[in-house]
Swiss-Prot record:
It comes from Tetraodon nigroviridis. The twin Cx2C motifs are involved in the recognition by the mitochondrial CHCHD4/MIA40-GFER/ERV1 disulfide relay system. The formation of 2 disulfide bonds in the Cx2C motifs through dithiol/disulfide exchange reactions effectively traps the protein in the mitochondrial intermembrane space. The C-terminal domain binds 2 Fe-S clusters but is otherwise mostly in an intrinsically disordered conformation. Gene3D superfamilies: Vaccinia Virus protein VP39. One of its GO terms (molecular function) is electron transfer activity. Residues 6-172 are annotated as: N-terminal SAM-like domain. This is Anamorsin. Residues 236-252 are annotated as: Fe-S binding site A.
């Protein structure tokens, strides 16, 4: 009992599991009550009923779970989370559990138990003791769980709840008094080094400076304006037995040439009037005008005549 670290005046939660004997459970609860005294309190809960209890959050200073020699239970994540909830910030948890040297269907290794405690929110997880099970305890666990191996140990672990509640916040004070020292100023560049990479305007008039005139590199043929026809590719728009067609993104002028030819062809196909007044309406049209009876239209506008109209004309 002295190894549990329970002090007078503390509120202690004692969790037990089957197959603990009622007499053993009563003696242990009375022993805890004598330690905490009248200023403290000991609450007893079954591990399977812990999640159904109505304990308020941050109630107990210490929780002792399944430490009786004749009790055995596997602490689930929900059970450990509930123990963390009812403990006060900084509260202590002491638990015992049967572990195995290899992964089993129900029992787990000590490393797995440590990981489960940390996932439940506990810190400072420490192994206090580890002992082999007695033949009677081993037989009872085999009967209850169906475990067939011999590598079973009873391990006692201690863990602590952090000094803060889940979801709590705290203001962080930032001090701007001690600022980081400013870096030393960069040295000024050497003027001689800068001159090596610059061409002074005064150097342009030096007789010793020999610059090449780019125009002198061109001959008379290079300066002549090229003939547009010479810029056209030899095979551009040429296809035996096919209509002349410009290339996509044409740059030789064939596309513009074909467009101009198309516009001129449309102009020649426009209907011609002998009097030149057909577009004004029936009042200005001749008796044999093919546009007779049609509304006025703009000069040059394309008008389609049906076969009946042409026959009547």
């Amino acid at each position: 009992m002295a190894t549990l670290g329970i002090k007078a005046g503390e509120n202690v939660l004692m969790v037990w599991a089957q197959p603990s004997k009622p007499a053993t459970l009563k003696d242990y609860a009375e022993e805890l009550s004598s330690i905490v005294g009248t200023d403290g309190k000991v609450s007893v809960e079954n591990v399977d009923r812990l999640l159904l209890s109505s304990h308020s959050a941050s109630t107990f200073d210490c929780a002792v779970s399944c430490v009786l020699a004749d009790s055995s239970a596997v602490h689930s994540l929900d059970t450990l989370a509930e123990l963390a909830r009812v403990l006060k910030p900084g509260g202590k948890l002491i638990l015992e559990e049967v572990v195995t040297g290899a992964e089993a269907q129900r029992e787990r290794t000590s490393e797995k138990l440590v990981s489960t405690l940390k996932l439940s929110g506990f810190t400072s997880v420490t192994e206090i003791s580890k002992a082999e099970l007695s033949p009677d305890a081993l037989s009872a666990i085999r009967t209850a769980t169906g475990y067939q191996g011999n590598a079973l140990f009873r391990i006692r672990m201690s863990a602590s709840k952090p000094d803060f509640e889940v979801g709590s916040s705290s203001q962080i004070k930032l001090s701007f008094g001690n600022k980081a020292p400013r870096p030393a100023d960069k040295p000024a560049p050497d003027p001689n080094t800068v001159k090596m990479w610059m061409l002074s305007a005064n150097d342009m008039n030096d007789d010793d400076l020999d610059l090449v005139d780019s125009d002198s590199l061109l001959d008379e043929e290079d300066l002549k304006k090229p003939d547009p026809s010479s810029l056209k590719a030899s095979t551009c728009g040429e296809a035996a037995g096919k209509k002349k067609k410009a290339c996509k993104n044409c740059t030789c002028g064939l596309a513009e040439e074909l467009e101009q030819e198309s516009k001129e062809k449309e102009k020649t196909n426009l209907p011609k009037s002998a009097c030149g007044s057909c577009y004004l309406g029936d009042a200005f049209r001749c008796a044999s005008c093919p546009y007779l009876g049609m509304p006025a239209f703009k000069p040059g506008e394309k008008i389609l005549l049906d076969n009946k109209t042409l026959t009547d004309a």
